[in-house]
């Protein structure tokens, strides 16, 4: 059975940390493919503060160009209304049929997992893969993982990855302050930021 990773996010902008996480998940879990799923109208974030979805899609598409095992899906962008994870996973499950899905997300999401809508469907349609993030204690995360495993009769995969302390927020702030960002971004993404004059002071 084909194994497909699903890596969702706002990607505003996508950076080398995202690429590293997706690659490590691909390698460690022996996935056949990782699908990047840029968020359309994410329920957990303020819509007015997010770059236009078409531009974010363009940045992700450019960033993953060199990798044959990465792809991009526009389901959440094309979908009208709020985008919830369980709906995305259900759509992919129904679209691909005979596949095993691995939903890749950060430690912050594990901490707040009980607030997610229809969490049982997330476990029904996918294997949850959680990677560590700066500021989160590994032992606390593993304890939380065990609690969710028992509560939902599942087996969350924990990836203990190298902490790359780069965030989209940091990059946006550096652009606003006219500081260099090209070393934090995949090739071509800086050009798109310049093309649309993103993140700069108005």
Curated annotation (Swiss-Prot):
Pathway: Cofactor biosynthesis; NAD(+) biosynthesis; deamido-NAD(+) from nicotinate D-ribonucleotide: step 1/1. InterPro entries: Cyt_trans-like, NadD/NMNAT, Rossmann-like_a/b/a_fold. It holds the Pfam family CTP_transf_like. One of its GO terms (molecular function) is nicotinate-nucleotide adenylyltransferase activity. Its EC number is 2.7.7.18. It catalyses: nicotinate beta-D-ribonucleotide + ATP + H(+) = deamido-NAD(+) + diphosphate. It comes from the Bacteria. Keywords: ATP-binding, NAD, Nucleotide-binding, Nucleotidyltransferase, Pyridine nucleotide biosynthesis, Transferase. GO terms for biological process: NAD biosynthetic process. HAMAP family: NaMN_adenylyltr. PANTHER family: NICOTINATE-NUCLEOTIDE ADENYLYLTRANSFERASE-RELATED, PHOSPHOPANTETHEINE ADENYLYLTRANSFERASE. Catalyzes the reversible adenylation of nicotinate mononucleotide (NaMN) to nicotinic acid adenine dinucleotide (NaAD). Belongs to the NadD family. This is Probable nicotinate-nucleotide adenylyltransferase. It comes from Clostridium perfringens (strain 13 / Type A).
